[in-house]
């Protein structure tokens, strides 16, 4: 059975990282939102009524990375060195990729994952009126495949 460092019996605790050495850390995460092709086209051409979808999602991802310890209770507050947010698209999807670097005692995976999640949620929020069907449902829209694709320590 794997060892869970955040659990001690029936108690939940923040892991003590004070004895760890400080090294450069990097994590890259990605995730995808599936949309109607007309919606992706509107994002590409900048004709979404709420404004520039990807610029807004980039800002939201950056803010989310910096707020991760307030959202995930056992995450350490760590100094963030850099945040990069990139988007790629297909005819029916947009993939967000967030890279976070730090120089510290613990990794930045949760920060990268949080950034990706909030970027994708922001995209959904900005285009939801175009994604709903006549019943107010989202038959096409979905967020998937959020994962860490690279991690470097040292």
From Swiss-Prot:
What the entry lists under InterPro entries is as follows: Mo_CF_biosynth-C_arc, MoaC, MoaC_sf, Mopterin_CF_biosynth-C_dom
Q: What pathway does the annotation place this protein in? A: Cofactor biosynthesis; molybdopterin biosynthesis
Q: Say which enzyme class the record assigns.
A: lyase
Residues at the active site: 125
Q: Gene that codes for this?
A: moaC
Describe the protein's quaternary organization and the partners it interacts with: Homohexamer; trimer of dimers.
EC no.? 4.6.1.17
Looking up HAMAP family in the UniProt record yields: MoaC_A (MF_01224_A)
Q: What is this protein called?
A: Probable cyclic pyranopterin monophosphate synthase
Gene3D superfamilies from the UniProt entry: Molybdopterin cofactor biosynthesis C (MoaC) domain (3.30.70.640)
Q: Can you tell which superkingdom this protein's organism belongs to?
A: Archaea
Q: Which UniProt keywords apply?
A: Lyase, Molybdenum cofactor biosynthesis
Catalytic activity from the UniProt record:
(8S)-3',8-cyclo-7,8-dihydroguanosine 5'-triphosphate = cyclic pyranopterin phosphate + diphosphate
Is Lyase one of the keywords UniProt gives this record?
yes
Residues given in the record as substrate binding sites: 74-76, 110-111
Give one Pfam family, short name only: MoaC
């Amino acid at each position: 059975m794997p060892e869970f460092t955040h659990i001690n019996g029936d108690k939940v605790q923040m892991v003590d990282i004070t004895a760890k050495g400080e090294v450069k850390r990097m994590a890259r995460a990605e995730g995808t939102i599936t949309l109607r092709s007309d919606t992706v086209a509107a994002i590409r051409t900048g004709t979404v009524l709420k404004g520039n979808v990807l610029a807004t999602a980039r800002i939201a991802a950056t803010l989310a990375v910096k707020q991760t310890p307030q959202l995930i209770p056992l995450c350490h507050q760590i100094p963030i060195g850099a945040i990069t947010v990139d988007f790629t698209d297909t005819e029916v999807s947009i993939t967000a990729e967030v890279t976070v670097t730090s120089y510290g005692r613990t990794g930045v995976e949760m920060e990268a994952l949080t950034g990706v999640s909030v970027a994708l949620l922001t995209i959904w929020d900005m285009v939801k009126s175009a994604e709903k069907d006549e019943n107010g449902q989202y038959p096409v829209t979905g967020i998937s495949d959020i994962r860490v694709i690279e991690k470097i320590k040292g």
